[in-house]
């Protein structure tokens, strides 16, 4: 039999109730309603279904936190539900569910035959659930008798956290022997299912008929007026897409077509040409083939699918930036990173404001240029390019210039590769009640930053740096309260951050002017790949190892580094020309390029240097190969 999929996609992980068995996911529903009813609280079907897919005790806990239920509980018992109440409810829930669970193990239509086809194409079948292992000890064998049995099952009680966390999916990948996560598909029927798959870096497919989200019996679906059913399904589909589902299907019979589509999307990357060289620069940088392949499709800026993707990107950026996601928002701005730096300075500092510009490199100094162009008052706090920021000097300027309203500085100054003390300056900003702007262009996504912990009001970065997208837009992580005060301040039509934010909020991700659609789609793919790598912590570790590898190898060849190790970033390293050797940079550059590597010239005017970046789709083995090429150049 010729495979029509299964070359790129290796496994499908299914949910249980509402996806593969128990049409409509009714087994736990009535029990959730009953345990509250026993306490004189009538919960609605919608309330009982909303947390579906989660570990059942977490489901009960979330119901207890719903405003209406919590208020009724408080009126009846004189207090809001406590953790003891949650445990008591669960203690009743579990035995009641056990009594009826066996009745809800019949496979949903099209499941058994679809999975048989998947296996014939060589796919492995995994599963996750919101049930405990004890519950699944009833469901799993009974479903097997009726024709459905996956290759692997993991329950929330066997990992540190259930949905929407990705840990159960990771367990499936390990048990099934499948990697990367992008070669796996998650299929489910709840919002938490969708998020589980997305958070795991998998393709996420949501099914409507039989789902908990639709909440109808098979008989109701078959007998309902077609237009009424269509309207209900449309609402469910929208919820799934807003949660991040890549595809939404009506029934499991459509899954094969989706797998073929995913396979073809993945195969596109096979037709993306290899790069002629590795970019060892601080951005633009080397990207994955899958990021480049994601730009092969055209997108309409008005289309809801594209705008939903924009909203998803915005949410993911805020989640990368802070744990307090309610306090911050993100705004995407067309253009290079400097466009966004100019936009935030011009959109937040009024004619009566004054900016303290802390600079020890070209990109800090560029902020002064922006102020001069925009006629913004500023206090100059410039250090030499090879100097560290002196916090005493910064604080003295704050004391001497009480009319300063804002502070700005660069986190990773790629002029030298130095990391600046943004957290310490953030403490000063808070102490002196100043608005704090950080240019984290070459660090965000590659070095852990929590904007709330660092007291950052506005953080600026761009698509083509540590998140490993391509050039085309910048973005601002903004304190909502401070951004809301900025209406009418902007000194530019197209660089008005407040207006861009307002439009994106009111129009579900729409940009004010034409957006770089292909770049946004590539950035979304890059975000998924960052999550798949293990988020910022793991990417930082890789970048750090890259930097250490090339720095240590080149030091052994006579190339000293400019910045001390304690201030050296993992982003880019500035090397001094070797002593006692004839060294001509363009000859060196050309030799490296001919051998598959592109580096940066130095940016200092009074010291002979060159720079090597360590970010992007680059690994320590690449740095070892680069060092070997440099050694051959030196020893010619």
UniProtKB/Swiss-Prot annotation:
Database matches in InterPro entries: Aminotrans_V_dom, HAD-like_sf, HAD-SF_hydro_IA, HAD_sf, NH2EtPonate_pyrv_transaminase, PGP-like_dom2, Phosphonoacetald_hydro, PyrdxlP-dep_Trfase
Active site: 15 (nucleophile), 56 (schiff-base intermediate with substrate)
Entry's family note: In the N-terminal section; belongs to the HAD-like hydrolase superfamily. PhnX family.
Binding site for Mg(2+): 15, 17, 189
Subunit description: Homodimer.
Database matches in Pfam families: Aminotran_5, Hydrolase
PANTHER family per UniProt: 2-AMINOETHYLPHOSPHONATE--PYRUVATE TRANSAMINASE
Domain of life assignment: Bacteria
Upper taxonomic lineage: Bacteria, Bacillati, Bacillota, Clostridia, Peptostreptococcales
Keyword annotations of the record: Aminotransferase, Hydrolase, Magnesium, Metal-binding, Multifunctional enzyme, Pyridoxal phosphate, Pyruvate, Schiff base, Transferase
NCBIfam families: HAD-SF-IA-v1, PhnW-AepZ, phosphonatase, PRK13479.1, transamin_PhnW
GO annotation terms (biological process): organic phosphonate catabolic process
EC number: 3.11.1.1, 2.6.1.37
Protein name: Bifunctional phosphonoacetaldehyde hydrolase/aminoethylphosphonate transaminase
Organism, as annotated: Clostridioides difficile (strain 630)
GO molecular function: 2-aminoethylphosphonate-pyruvate transaminase activity; magnesium ion binding; phosphonoacetaldehyde hydrolase activity
């Amino acid at each position: 039999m010729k495979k029509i999929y299964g070359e790129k996609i290796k496994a499908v992980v299914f949910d249980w109730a509402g996806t593969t068995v128990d049409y409509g996911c009714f087994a736990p529903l009535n029990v959730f309603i009953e345990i509250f009813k026993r306490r004189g609280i009538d919960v609605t079907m919608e309330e009982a279904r909303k947390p579906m897919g989660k570990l059942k005790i977490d489901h009960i806990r979330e119901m207890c936190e719903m405003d209406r239920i919590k208020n009724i509980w408080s009126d009846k018992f004189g207090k809001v539900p406590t953790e003891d109440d949650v445990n008591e409810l669960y203690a009743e829930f579990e035995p009641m569910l056990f009594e009826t669970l066996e009745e809800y193990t019949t496979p949903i239509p099209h499941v058994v035959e679809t999975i048989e086809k998947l296996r014939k194409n060589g796919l492995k079948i995994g599963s996750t659930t919101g049930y405990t292992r004890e519950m699944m000890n009833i469901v799993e064998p009974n479903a097997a008798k009726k024709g459905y049995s996956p290759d692997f099952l993991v329950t929330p009680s066997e990992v540190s956290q259930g949905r929407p966390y990705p840990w159960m999916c990771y367990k499936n990948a390990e048990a099934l022997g499948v990697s990367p996560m992008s070669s796996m598909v998650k299929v489910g029927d709840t919002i938490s299912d969708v998020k589980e798959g997305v958070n795991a870096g998998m393709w996420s497919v949501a099914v409507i008929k039989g789902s908990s989200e639709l909440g109808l019996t098979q008989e109701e679906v078959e007998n309902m007026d077609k237009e009424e059913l269509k309207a209900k399904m449309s609402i469910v589909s929208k919820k799934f897409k807003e949660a991040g589902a890549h595809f939404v299907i009506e029934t499991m019979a459509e899954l094969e077509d989706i797998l073929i589509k995913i396979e073809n999307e993945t195969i596109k990357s096979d037709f993306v040409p290899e790069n002629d060289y590795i970019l060892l620069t601080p951005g633009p940088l080397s990207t994955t083939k899958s990021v480049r392949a994601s730009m092969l499709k055209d997108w309409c800026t008005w289309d809801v699918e594209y705008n939903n993707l924009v909203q998803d990107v915005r949410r993911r950026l805020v989640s990368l930036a802070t744990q307090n996601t309610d306090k911050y928002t993100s705004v995407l701005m067309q253009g290079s990173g400097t466009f966004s730096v100019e936009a935030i300075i011009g959109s937040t500092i009024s004619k009566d404001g004054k900016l303290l510009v802390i600079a020890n490199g070209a990109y800090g100094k560029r902020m002064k240029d922006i102020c001069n162009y925009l006629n913004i008052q500023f206090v100059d706090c410039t250090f030499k390019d090879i100097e560290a920021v002196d916090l005493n000097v910064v604080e003295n300027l704050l004391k001497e210039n009480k009319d300063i309203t804002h502070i700005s500085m660069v986190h990773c100054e790629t002029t030298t590769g130095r990391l600046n003390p943004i957290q310490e300056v953030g403490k000063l900003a808070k102490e002196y009640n100043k608005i704090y702007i950080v240019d984290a262009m070459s660090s965000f996504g590659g070095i852990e930053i929590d904007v709330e912990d660092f007291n950052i009001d506005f953080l600026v970065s761009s698509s083509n740096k540590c998140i490993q997208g391509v050039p085309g837009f910048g973005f601002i992580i903004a304190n909502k309260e401070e951004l809301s005060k900025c209406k009418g301040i902007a000194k530019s039509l197209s660089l008005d951050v407040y207006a861009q934010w307002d439009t994106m909020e009111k129009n579900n991700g729409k940009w004010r002017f034409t957006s770089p659609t292909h770049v946004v789609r590539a950035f979304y793919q890059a975000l998924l790949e960052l999550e798949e790598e293990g988020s910022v912590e793991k990417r930082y570790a890789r970048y750090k190892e890259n930097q250490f590898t090339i720095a240590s190898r080149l030091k052994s060849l006579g190339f000293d580094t400019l910045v001390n190790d304690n201030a050296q970033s993992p982003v880019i390293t500035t090397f001094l020309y070797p002593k006692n050797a004839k060294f001509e940079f363009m000859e060196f550059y050309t030799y490296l390029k001919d051998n598959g590597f592109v580096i940066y010239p130095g940016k200092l005017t009074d010291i002979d240097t060159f720079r090597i970046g360590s970010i992007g789709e680059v690994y320590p083995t690449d740095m070892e190969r680069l060092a070997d090429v440099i050694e051959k150049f030196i020893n010619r």
